[in-house]
Structure formats: C-alpha cells, structure tokens
Amino acid sequence: MSNKVHLGHTARKRFGQNFLTDDSIISRIVGAISPDNDHVMVEIGPGLGAITEPVAMSIDKLSVVELDRDLVERLQNHPTLKDKLDIHQGDALQFDFSTLQQAGKKMKVFGNLPYNISTPLMFHLFEFAEIIETMHFMLQKEVVLRLSASPGCKAYGRLTVMAQYYCQVVPVLEVPPHSFTPAPKVDSAVVRLLPYANKPWPCKDVTVLRHLCTTAFNMRRKTLRNNLKQLISDEEFGLLNIDASLRPEQISVEQYVALANLLCDKQ
C-alpha cells in the first residue's frame, strides 16, 4: 500500500493532506486544546479524525470545517462520531466562523492545518479574534517560528506583527515528520494563539496596519525610510522616536501600531 494511503483514504496533494498518526503526539495536542462544553469547539480540517475523535468523545458537540467531500462523507457515516459532529463542508479560507457563535460562549479553534494555506488562513481567523478564546494549530515549524519571532530575527515579518497584534503566541511542541502519513518533507510544530481581550497596543484602523506591514516588508533588505517613503517622512519617524535607517524586521509590534495610528491621524 502506498504511504500516501491511510485508513483507505489517499492523501490529496492539492489539499496539502498529511494525516497525524502518532498516538502520544495526539494525546499531548488534545491536552493542550483542553476541550470542554463551556466553549464552542471548532476543528478546521478534521481529516481522518485523529484529533477529532478524542476531542468529540469528551464533549457534547464539535463543529468541523472540511473541504474534502470524501472525508466529509466518512465523518457523516462514522459509527461513533456522526452524532457528535456539526459538519460544514467548505473552504475554511472562505468560511464565516461567526455563524458558529452561541450565546455566552467563545470558541476554541484547532486543527492540523494544510501547510499550503496556513498563512492566509491565519489572516482570515484574525478577523474573528474577538469571538475566539484559544487557537491550537499544527503548522510547518517555519511558520510557528515566524508567528513567535522577536524583532531582529530573520523569521520576523508581516505575519509576526499581525499575529502578535491580535494574540499572545506560545509554541507548544515540535512534531517530527514520521508522526504523519505520508511523512511531510518539513518539520512541524503546534502553536497556541491566545487572542487578547484588550489589545496591548490598540490600532485605530487594522486595515491601515495590514497595508503598512505589507509595504514595509515588501523589500526586507531596504530600510524603513526607503520602503515607507511614500507614507511617512523622516520628521514623522522622529516624532515617534523610530530610527528610519533600520530594516523592517528591527522594530517592534508596538512601533508598527504607532506608525499605523500616525497614518490614521493623517487621513
């Protein structure tokens, strides 16, 4: 049998499917997620149910979002899971997670995310941060390093700034390739994202912050002065005590928010 086949299902490359099969890793992830009935529990990409089953068995109801029709059908016919699941067949990148809201409950969102969509999916989920209590995701280790990076690190970038604007970022554990079928060609890691109830550095318009970060990091080897010359003058950098000769990865999330708020005030 091909190493791409697990439990009779062939992993689809276009969906970025790698199925978690290591029981000890699964147990640690479920422990980190801490499923309960006080939150709306939501899984993105349940796949063949490695994490789905232990989570669903410990709560009343689990909402799942799955794109692959074959996997949706398996879940709908699963002998023990079918009555526990609220199944949504569709693309998580387009899904309106606010439709899963319940009165008085925030969400706990988790998943073994397809690596080919993990970054755009993060940006999509940040839009729902106010209704989410925790997020736990299996990601490419490189993405976790980017999410948790500090200023001055090579991994620090647009994703870092936006993630840390919305959330506290906590790496949880590293997962080797042999924990999956088929084994991915990269190392993986689990990250915990805790959306802030009160953001430490509130931005007047997050759209402006996103645009600022995209522009600043577009050419990483150039200075802030060069990259942002159409937006911010040397005098304005000086007002905020930001050195315009620094590169984009050398200033903090707080400083990016200060620059964005300056731009908001100019509009």
Swiss-Prot record:
Catalysis: reaction(s): adenosine(1518)/adenosine(1519) in 16S rRNA + 4 S-adenosyl-L-methionine = N(6)-dimethyladenosine(1518)/N(6)-dimethyladenosine(1519) in 16S rRNA + 4 S-adenosyl-L-homocysteine + 4 H(+)
Gene3D superfamilies registered for this protein in UniProt: Ribosomal RNA adenine dimethylase-like, domain 2, Vaccinia Virus protein VP39
Record SUPFAM superfamilies: S-adenosyl-L-methionine-dependent methyltransferases
Its EC number(s): 2.1.1.182
Main location: cytoplasm
Subcellular location: Cytoplasm
Matches recorded under PROSITE patterns: RRNA_A_DIMETH, SAM_RNA_A_N6_MT
A molecular function (GO) term: 16S rRNA (adenine(1518)-N(6)/adenine(1519)-N(6))-dimethyltransferase activity
Keywords: Cytoplasm, Methyltransferase, RNA-binding, rRNA processing, S-adenosyl-L-methionine, Transferase
GO annotation, cellular component aspect: cytosol
Binding site for S-adenosyl-L-methionine: N18, L20, G45, E66, D91, N112
Family: Belongs to the class I-like SAM-binding methyltransferase superfamily. rRNA adenine N(6)-methyltransferase family. RsmA subfamily.
HAMAP family: 16SrRNA_methyltr_A
Protein function: Specifically dimethylates two adjacent adenosines (A1518 and A1519) in the loop of a conserved hairpin near the 3'-end of 16S rRNA in the 30S particle. May play a critical role in biogenesis of 30S subunits.
Name by which UniProt lists this protein: Ribosomal RNA small subunit methyltransferase A
